């Protein structure tokens, strides 16, 4: 479960926060406009955040990664944005 402290720490200058509650956070990067769904799963040995991603609002989500914390997932998203903004070649659908 995400704590209020974790939710309050989300960088609102970097992200548009669409949803933020104890189990789900939906963000849109203001840099790439990619949409991210972060879902908290409670497991017997701790928690994991499953990260879903889509490039456009009209696209379906796909699984992007898993992280052990909300903070780590957000750092990974920012790293992905840097990868996108530093010249990643566009992926073309076949």
Language-model regions, residue ranges each:
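Glutamate identity and glutamate-enriched acidic tracts
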Residues: 6, 42, 47, 82-84, ...
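Low-complexity, intrinsically disordered short peptide segments enriched in small/polar/basic residues
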Residues: 15, 47-48, 71-74
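Short aromatic-glycine-(Arg/Gly/Cys) micro-motifs in beta-strand/loop hairpins
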Residues: 33-63
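Mixed-charge, Lys/Arg-enriched low-complexity segments
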Residues: 53-94
